[in-house]
Regions:
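Signature of alpha-helical transmembrane segments and their immediate interfacial
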Residues: 2-42, 378, 392-443, 457-460
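Transmembrane alpha-helices and their membrane-interface boundaries in multi-pass membrane transporters
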Residues: 276, 293-305, 329-348, 353-395
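Juxtamembrane segments of multi-pass membrane proteins
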Residues: 408-410, 414-534
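Alpha-helical transmembrane helix bundles of large polytopic membrane transport and channel proteins
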Residues: 92, 96-172, 177, 189-193, ...
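Hydrophobic transmembrane alpha-helices
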Residues: 243-247, 264, 280-301, 344, ...
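Helix-loop junctions and hydrophobic alpha-helical segments within the transmembrane domains
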Residues: 310-337
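Interfacial segments of transmembrane alpha-helices in multi-pass membrane proteins
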Residues: 226-281, 348-352
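Extracytoplasmic
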Residues: 61, 92, 140-253, 491, ...
Length: 602
């Protein structure tokens, strides 16, 4: 007798000699894990979605604080459906929505931008010099005079296409998010954040005149988690379909329920184990329970089929269960361990959510070994297979179904030859076209959601009505301390900016050079001849004395170049990356490096 057979017989004797004790222990264990499984919560993290060891992400994380307004942000659009934004009722709603968003936990309140926040300002050159202020005038009372002032201030602020739509029918509240909830110190709960936006903003302020649109990573995740309830309904439907198919196949109700219950217990035990390990269910791993259930049913059906086969030969229910265990245990555990190892290889992908998916799948497969290869044979050794099912199997043993006859023809010439030829052709075609496989998103908006989902419709509205799109790609121009405003560095930034503006897929590009040019323009009586960079260091410093936050860091060692894209498709991103890379190679310069990449598209 081989070593493997001795091992199987050892486990068979161990399990079936102590089947009451083992089954009781497994029931108690599954009860504990099932309770833990009911406590598992949906979770998502912005950083877990990123390959944190990738060069681009390392560059972003090194300047994460300085670029907080350009990474994980939410845009809330307040649209006037029956007019424009220069309306007293609209401005009242915009003010209230701004306040609502401001007080939602997780919003970085220092970086919040709206027409009603003091960090959004206008500036003008007059005979007396520079004047400026907030968009909303002091003492605002909703009068036509005040609304005219707001219109004038918006036109002077440069926010048209950015915070204000090109048709003046809507405006944006830009809310950068924190990684943690400041009230609890825990990672930001995107589901609760998304729910707060829906309850406190969209549901509260949407009316016959006002439409609220919301986009951003947090909203995508929130919508995906909301969809988890639909996933539960689909799971219940899958269970029902499997019940019907198993009964139709075996004609044994008790074994059908045994297989399905063991597979469901595997799912709950998996969720419970993940909860004990400190993991939750993220939008990418919420479909793993389907996988665990499917694998469990697959192995369960094989066990039931084997028990029926042995019962046909006259074996009693205990002996039939033992023989089925003996014939399938080694093959089953080998297959499941292979599955677990296969899922574990996903750990090499350096993205948190993918690694958690690998852990979830591997844990689920490991638990199937207990619930379906150990517990199920024990259960069937007690309840057995119904005589009706055994008789049904015996009658159909020699009956060949139409489907079997159809596929059997493929083992004979000429269909066998045709099958091989077609297979080789499909393989060759697949091999050829695989070289054109795109990495990344192929459609605009959030590919995780349907094209006609509310989120993607909201995103399409912003792309259509705003110059500054929701897809932002940021290049970090890194210099020495106090060197980002040096003339030579500004010239290189300006040249790269010009090339990017003339790159397919780019809507607009802004950087510190735009601020400096506008400063020169303003300091020289608004003469268009002076819209340029100045070689004099003191003049440059003067032009940047009022630089808005986010255009340089504290010690002027990094200046972001902000690129607004048409979309975040793979082709668009590759084009932008190649433009920056080629520029860096063509114009190497000591003292400045163009680092990729930040922003939600970076």
């Amino acid at each position: 007798m081989s070593h493997s057979n001795k091992l199987v017989l050892f486990f068979e004797k161990l399990i079936f000699s102590n089947r009451i004790l083992i089954l009781t222990s497994l029931i108690l264990l599954c009860a504990v894990l099932t309770f833990q499984g009911t406590q598992v919560k949906p979770e998502a993290s912005f950083l877990k979605m990123l390959p944190t060891n990738h060069e681009f992400i390392k560059n972003f994380l090194s300047y994460k604080k300085e670029l907080s307004n350009l990474g994980n942000v939410v845009r809330v659009v307040v649209e006037n459906k029956n007019g424009d934004i220069f309306d007293a009722d609209y401005q009242e709603v915009l003010k209230n929505v701004t306040d609502e968003v401001f007080f939602i936990s997780g919003v970085n309140r220092d970086g919040l931008k709206s027409l009603w926040t003091p960090n959004v300002r206008w500036q003008e050159v007059t005979e007396e010099g520079f004047i400026g202020g907030s968009i909303i005038p002091d003492g605002y009372n909703g009068s036509k005079k005040n609304l005219d002032i707001i219109k004038s201030n918006i036109l002077k602020s440069g926010q048209v296409g950015n915070l204000v739509s090109n048709d003046f029918k809507s405006s944006i509240i830009l809310a950068p998010l924190q990684d943690t909830n400041p009230e609890t110190g825990l990672p930001l709960d995107y589901h609760q954040f998304s729910k707060a936006l829906e309850d406190n903003v969209r549901a509260k302020y949407t009316s016959e005149n006002i439409n609220i649109r919301i986009v951003g990573f947090a909203k995508v995740v929130g919508d995906l988690i909301d969809g988890a309830m639909q996933v539960v309904l689909f799971f219940m439907l899958a269970v029902l379909i499997v019940l019907l198919l198993l009964w139709f196949y075996s004609r044994c109700l008790r074994s059908t329920f045994a297989v399905v219950i063991c597979s469901i217990l595997a799912v709950f035990a998996q969720l419970g184990t993940l909860n004990i390990m400190g993991y939750g269910i993220n939008p990418y791993s919420m479909l793993v329970p389907f996988l665990v259930f499917a694998i469990g049913v697959s192995h369960g059906v094989q066990i039931v089929n084997s028990i029926i086969h042995h019962a046909e030969t006259g074996a009693n229910k205990l002996d039939a269960a033992k023989l089925a265990f003996r014939s399938l245990y080694l093959a089953g555990i080998t297959a499941l361990i292979s599955d677990a190892i296969g899922f574990t290889t996903l750990m090499v992908i350096d993205i948190g959510v993918i690694q958690e998916l690998a852990i979830a799948a591997s844990v689920g497969v490991a638990i199937i070994i207990i619930t379906n290869l150990v517990a199920l044979p024990i259960i069937l050794s007690f309840i057995g297979i119904s005589p009706k099912a055994v008789e049904y199997s015996r009658k159909n043993t020699h009956n060949i179904s139409l489907v079997e006859k159809l596929f059997a023809n493929f083992t004979k010439a000429p269909l066998a030859i045709l099958t091989i030829v077609v297979s080789v052709g499909l393989f060759s075609g697949g091999l050829y076209y695989s070289q054109f496989m795109k990495i990344g998103d192929l459609d605009a908006g959030a590919p995780e959601l349907r094209p006609d989902s509310r989120y993607n419709l909201d995103n399409a509205f912003i792309v259509e009505n705003y110059t500054a799109s929701t897809d932002v790609f940021v290049i970090m121009a890194e210099t020495g301390a106090d060197q980002c405003s040096k003339y030579n560095n500004l010239v290189l930034i300006d040249q790269l900016q010009w090339q990017l503006k003339n790159t397919a897929g780019v809507q607009d590009v802004i950087s510190i050079t735009d601020i400096s040019k506008l400063g020169m323009f303003g300091m020289n009586e608004g003469s268009l001849k002076w819209v340029n960079l100045n070689r004099n260091e003191f003049v440059v410093n003067a032009t940047l004395s009022q630089v808005p936050s986010g255009f340089i860091n504290a010690d002027c060692s990094m200046a972001p170049i902000i690129v607004f894209l048409n979309d975040h498709k793979a082709d668009t991103l590759n084009t932008v990356v190649n433009t920056v890379t080629d520029f860096s190679k063509q114009y190497p310069q000591d003292g400045i490096k163009f680092l990729l990449a930040a922003g939600n598209a970076g």
